[in-house]
Amino acid sequence: MFLFYVNPILIAAAVIPAIVLLRFVYKEDRLDKESPGLLLSLVIFGILSTFAAIVTEQIGEAILGILLPQSSTAYNALLYFVVVALSEEGFKYLLLKKRTWYSGEFNCQFDGVVYAVFVSLGFALWENLGYVAMYGLSTALVRAVTAVPGHACFGVFMGVYYGRAKRYDNDGDFVKAKRCRTMAVLMPALLHGAYDFIATMEDPNCEWMFLVFVLALFAVSLKLVRVGSRSD
């Protein structure tokens, strides 16, 4: 309901970064483009995954607060790598697989990247609306070049492994398919956890570490998209 009380400029600032990235990935799908209905449903599934993640994160954070002091490194590591990252990437993956694994449109390996990025950006879009509604335009500008493309990058890594899993499954290599499906959750969760963990460290030197990490994440993700789109 908060959307009805947010300035249209703020809504645009929150939504446009995700739309730009969605369009970019869609254009990179050069072979047998996916139907608009499927892609829209993936964005909606990404939005739905935020609600499941919120509940899981609240429960996980409460349990973690009982077990460890909040000021400890162990608390922060478990919070960001397990409670937050694994919850968010896990629910994205579950809804991604539910919607696309048996879809007749899933006929190219790069489709896995397209699907995962659309789910991830659905998540990022909805999350971004909440942050911008609470904190304003300055937050929108920062997140437009950090958190939103960050979610897209996590989606790229998820999609790379998800697409490989589908290829192996089609070839009858179910062991490798299962291994890739596992990596489709673990790899983006690891990157997501590292992103959050480094971003929240209080050491001033970590600002440079975060910048290097983000630039490397963006560069590798872009390379994976470029190579993947030309490999089918």
Indicate where each model-derived feature is located.
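Hydrophobic alpha-helical segments at protein termini of multi-pass membrane proteins
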Residues: M1-D232
